[in-house]
Amino acid sequence: HGGTAVGTGRGDQLNPALARGRFDWVLVPSDEGLSTPVVYARLDALRDAEGALADDPPLSLEVPAPVLQALRSGDPDLLSESIYNDLQEAALHERPELETTILRGIHAGALQGIVSGSGPTVALLCASPEGAQEVQSLLREHGLESLHVHGPVPGARILA
């Protein structure tokens, strides 16, 4: 299908979300993996330390309205103010150098940076294609390879 979607469950249940405009991202993969079970265990430990209890109400699986509004508006600045990842703090505990990558990206001009999923890939939201190219160039100076991607894009299509 392509486009923008909201993933729930294990990310396998997708529902389309309206997104206008173009969002440019710089993805910074890592040579070293990060175990998803380890990140979730760290998240549980962090929540336990904060006093979260097993019988607390479950976290909402709904996408916050500001995120959906930002996608509909096509405004990367607005999106940068509302994106977050519940797993990021746990991932950064396991791999603190990912925070350095995020900060380098923001210093290079990215609007915002987050850990993608349970990591270790870092996703840097940029204001424009030119901004993304500048971020890539400055990250390269620090020995970090990256990919410039944009969305939303259509899914696979048969051309014949």
Language-model-detected regions and their locations in the chain:
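Short hydrophobic/aromatic beta-strand micro-patches
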Residues: 29, 123-127
